[in-house]
Amino acid sequence: MSEDDLPDGCDYLIEDAVEALDNLDEEPVAIFLDDAWARPQRAQQFGVEYDTHPFDESQSGLRDHIDTSITTTEIIDKCYEVLADGGWLIADADDWLLPRLITYLQEQWGDVASSYNGGGYRKVGGVTYLSSDGNPDKSTAGMYLSTGGYPVVFAHKGETDRQSSVSARQVADRVREQYGWGSVKPISPYEEWVKGLVSPGELIAVPCAGTAPAALAAERMFGDEAQYVCIDVESDAKTAFKQRRANEINSYKQETID
């Protein structure tokens, strides 16, 4: 166990994402990125109570509460640099980030969805939230149609032997317990993607981690063989993660025993 009571091979760092990725001792085979800060014009609006940052350095007309010291493209570039050859990027997005992220990946990583050769942008999947009656959730606020979930972008570094028939589109119940954190995403979709693209004992990285559902998914799937590094600049994120882990992992272990 680490000093944070995490299993050997698992860590949660309070650091800048780019710097922490640069200092990894091992190449991750998958990076699960949730860059919730990439919504510059929503800073301090629509429930976004934290500072945000631009997608790239060319973005102009920015409001207050926007951190221009880092951009989404810097994080994406670093992900590509540190990923193992054939490794996957699984990136949560939203309506604003999705087209920009896809275009950037196509231009910088490649467009394997078009060429069927090499690597780069592969596919858009997503998570659809279910309501209590099992139908798609319609409670997401919004005047111009509700979202009821979020898109997820899949890309890989160069050609890859990491293949899976797991669906890129998953359904899940909305997480009700927030653990003092603003946005908590379900674990079950990431269990499927971890199971499909990662093997026990292989490292995954989770920058901009929050409560890090992908890390908890790896721990559920692989137990003591899980290997992950979570990264966030907010110490409250780590506190929320530890609370969630204590609840989710213990509950999961009890379910498997029962």
Residue ranges: model-predicted function:
Residues 1-8, 247-258:
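Haloarchaeal acidic low-complexity proteome signature biased toward cell-envelope/secretome components but also
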Residues 2-231:
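Core catalytic lobe of class I
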Residues 221, 245-248:
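The DNA-recognition helices of helix-turn-helix-type DNA-binding domains
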